[in-house]
A protein has these predicted regions:
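Residues embedded in well-ordered beta-strands
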Residues: 15-17, 56-58, 113, 129-131
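Intrinsically disordered, low-complexity terminal regulatory regions
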Residues: 1-29, 146, 153-154, 158-164
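Extended hydrophobic
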Residues: 85-154
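Short, charged/polar surface micro-motifs in flexible loops or helix N-caps
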Residues: 21-24, 32-35, 63-64
């Protein structure tokens, strides 16, 4: 199972996320074995713009759908690092497209970092995202590339299972 393998590889909680009604919905998760861990509840909804899985999905939406999202969502700050303007979010989404994965530096909750990659269908449309979430002290920026690459590997594994 790709989520379990990713959790074991990174040591952190992993989740499978979809976008619904302009929010991210946790479909499934594998909770970390660490004594201090981060997890959400399956079925929990969070704003897309303030979390890595949401940004990974938004980055690959067609431009018209992204603009529609921005027209319908009020961007507000949850922490000092939340991207709360359309221009700052669009700039970050370009970076996500360029590197292949999204990051969340405590943008939704203080002390929580996430790294995520999107699963695209055969038409390059975002289906869902896989994310690794953990406390900032164990997921510092220095680990983002390593974790991002692990997420991309898990995406390839999941995509092969669900789309082949």
């Amino acid at each position: 199972d790709a989520l379990r393998n990713l959790r074991d590889r990174t040591g952190e909680t992993t989740q499978l996320i979809v976008m619904t009604d302009n929010k991210c919905l946790i479909l499934e998760q594998c909770i970390s074995d660490q004594p201090i861990k981060v997890s959400g509840k399956v079925g929990m909804l969070v704003p897309c713009y303030s979390c890595a899985p949401g940004k990974s999905i938004l980055a690959d939406l067609p431009k018209g759908e992204l603009q529609e999202y921005l027209n319908h969502v009020t961007l507000k700050k949850f922490t000092p690092r939340t991207l709360a303007t359309g221009s700052s979010l669009k700039k970050e989404l370009k970076e996500v497209r360029d590197c292949g994965f999204a990051v969340d530096l405590a943008e939704g909750l203080e002390g929580i970092h996430c790294v995520s990659a999107v699963i695209l269908d055969d038409y390059h449309y975002p289906v869902c995202a896989i994310t690794t979430i953990g406390p900032a002290f164990r997921m510092p920026e220095e680990r983002f590339e390593e974790i991002g690459n692990a997420c991309l590997e898990a995406v390839r594994e999941i995509r092969k299972k669900i789309l082949d």
